[in-house]
Structure formats: structure tokens, C-alpha cells
Amino acid sequence: LYVARTTYLCWAHLAEAVREGKNQYLKTFGVPSEELFSAIYRSEGERLQFLRGLGDVWSVEGRGVLAAFDLSPFPLVCDLGGCSGALAKECTSLYAGCHVTVFDMPDVVQMAKRHFSFPEDGRISFREGDFFKDPLPEADLYLLARVLHDWTDDKCSRLLARIHGACRTGGGILVIESLLDADGRGPLTTQLYSLNMLVQTEGRERTPAQYRALLAPAGFHDIQCRRTGGTYDAILARK
């Protein structure tokens, strides 16, 4: 339903998006282009469909990306923009010693608590906030799953610098995205995702080198990229 009601409508303006180099929310929904989530979250029903869609993605793909690296040395995890907590659930299932804080906007957190919370697992908690503005929870590891591809390089750099400042010494960040090949000419699925980012967000999919170029200036080192063989890949960097 989310694809039919939001994504498909934006793709009707693909040619304009390519010419203008920006998303098509203004033409499609009358929403200013910089207000990325106003269209996605334009009603309670649309927000719920979006969160359910992301939850379905991580129920299929989550374990693979979280197992790309051994994350057991990171007992305290913060999932920034973690929506329903679906990826957090996969993380606590895979790593018995970890606790995960899901950090997202207040409306999202409240909906997650109503529809998706896991009261039987005390290792998952929710915290409200805007990761561009509000203090970030201290953690050993930050998960950024399908977050950086929403934003410009400048906004990604600002967010990564904030994460580095909040991260415990010796901790790290796990970026989960669909990686382009080094020359940017594939995989085809990732190229299509990048076009989708163009019509709907301020961002794009990136190559491993482009992610390194964002992470290193923010202060991260030992940056490792791993293909998972699935839809999404993993990048681990240390503070």
C-alpha cells in the first residue's frame, strides 16, 4: 500500500526529478521538497503502513546484515531511526548479551509502542528525539539502517559527526545500505533504489568509497565494507 500510495505517485515525475535533481513531493503531494517525511507520514494510516513495510524488510534481511560482522563486543546498541524496532528485535535475537535503544521521532515511537513493542523482551527500549537536533543516547554501537541514503552528503556528515561525539571510546557504527559497485554502474537493483531516493528524498545510494569519504572526516577509522549477498550490505567503522 505504501508503494502504491506514495512511491508510485512520485515515480510518475521521474523525468522531472532527473532534470531538477530533487525529489518530487511538491508536484505529487504539495509538500515542500525538504520535508521528506511529511508525505510518508501524512496520516496515521500511511505512517503505519510505512513502519510495517520496514518491519517486513528486517524480518527477512535483518539477520544477514547484523551477522556480516561479529557485533558481540558491543553490548549497548542504539538504532537511530529504528522505527518499529524490527531490526532491534533481530539484533537481540542474534546477540544474547546486547541491549538496544530505538531512537526515533516522537510520533513514530508512540506508534511503535502501540503496534510493535515487544514487552516480553526487556532488552529493547524506545527513546524519542530528532537525531539531527537532540542529544543522542550513549552507546557502544550505533545502527544506521537505510538512513544515510535519505540525505545529502552535508547532512550525512553532520549526523555522523554527532554520532562520533556520542559514541563510547572503542565503539563504532554499523551502516546498513545497498551498496553500489565501485564504478557506480551496478547492481541494477541498487541503481533503481538510487532513482527511488532521487524522486522521494534528498539522498542517493553510494559506493563503498563514498561512504568511507563520509565516515573518515567524522572521525571514524578501520572502515570495513562487506557484501552480504542479500539486498543490503554492511559497513562497520570504529571510533
Residue ranges and their predicted role:
Residues 1-75:
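Conserved Class I S-adenosyl-L-methionine-dependent methyltransferase catalytic core
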